[in-house]
């Protein structure tokens, strides 16, 4: 069941074309189905009993990056990812989500990441900040993590990294919406980070987004604050603790 607030956004978006030029998926495929308007129209039809939520519709809801380009450009404040994410919850609950998606969900539930592999550990002690590496950087672009830690060391920042870093919930939340399983992941992650007593520097902006926007809503706010790695390094540059090469 899609909540009334999400349906309200869908009903408004189904009349509007103003963000169709911003969707990267629609640009790539050329399909009207990939515009936020079309997805809003589909859910409106389901709500009015004019269409059933079937596998084809579920697949359409997964043809979205949840990048928020549409939301950021909306002059009236509507949020297509809100109803698209809830449509994904409906797809999973109704057992019409694509098999490939269900496999990724299984991977996240067993390993904490969509790749289905053991996450490398970057564990180290530190006293100034705790760096949250995240799943993508740890597994797919480890050089990003290594370079960030090297920069912090050069700036004299004592950075702690958890030996067993919990999943933030962002991957599962993107795949199946903000369900109870996602909130439980968030609670575990927030509790673990809060136990360090240190401010959190987050390497992946997607992890930072869920930590700053959803964790407080779910009652598991990170007490010492969250900063993205880019913002933290920018501050170090401003404070002359790092110098950019010409």
Could you say what each language-model-derived stretch is?
Residues 1-2, 197, 246:
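Intrinsic structural disorder
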Residues 17-20, 105-112, 176, 225-230:
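Short linear motifs at secondary-structure transitions and domain/linker junctions
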Residues 220-245:
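Short, flexible loop segments at boundaries between secondary-structure elements
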Residues 10, 40-219:
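Iron-sulfur-cluster electron-transfer modules
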Residues 1-61:
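Ferredoxin-type iron-sulfur electron-transfer modules and their immediate structural context
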Residues 119-126, 238-246:
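Short boundary motifs at domain starts and secondary-structure transition points
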């Amino acid at each position: 069941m899609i909540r009334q607030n999400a349906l309200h956004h869908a009903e408004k978006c189904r009349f509007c074309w103003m963000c169709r030029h911003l969707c990267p998926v629609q640009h790539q495929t050329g399909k009207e189905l990939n515009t936020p308007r079309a997805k809003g129209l589909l859910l409106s039809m389901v709500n009015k009993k004019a269409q059933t939520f079937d596998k084809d519709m579920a697949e359409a809801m997964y043809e979205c990056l949840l990048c928020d380009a549409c939301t950021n450009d909306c002059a009236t404040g509507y949020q297509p990812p809100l109803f698209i994410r809830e449509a994904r919850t409906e797809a999973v609950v109704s057992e019409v989500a694509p098999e490939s998606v269900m496999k990724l969900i299984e991977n996240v539930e067993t390993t904490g990441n969509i790749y289905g592999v053991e996450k490398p550990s970057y564990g180290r002690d530190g006293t100034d900040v705790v760096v949250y590496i995240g799943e993508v950087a740890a597994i797919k672009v480890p050089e990003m993590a290594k370079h960030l830690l090297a920069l912090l060391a050069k700036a004299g920042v004592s950075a702690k990294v958890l030996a067993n870093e919990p999943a933030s919930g962002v991957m599962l939340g993107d795949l199946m919406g903000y369900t109870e399983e996602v909130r439980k992941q968030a609670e575990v992650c927030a509790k673990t980070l809060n136990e360090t007593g240190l401010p959190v520097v987050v390497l992946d902006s997607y992890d930072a987004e869920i930590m700053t926007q959803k964790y407080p809503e779910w009652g598991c706010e990170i007490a010492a604050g969250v900063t993205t790695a880019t913002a933290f390094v920018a501050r170090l540059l401003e404070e002359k603790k790092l110098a950019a090469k010409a």
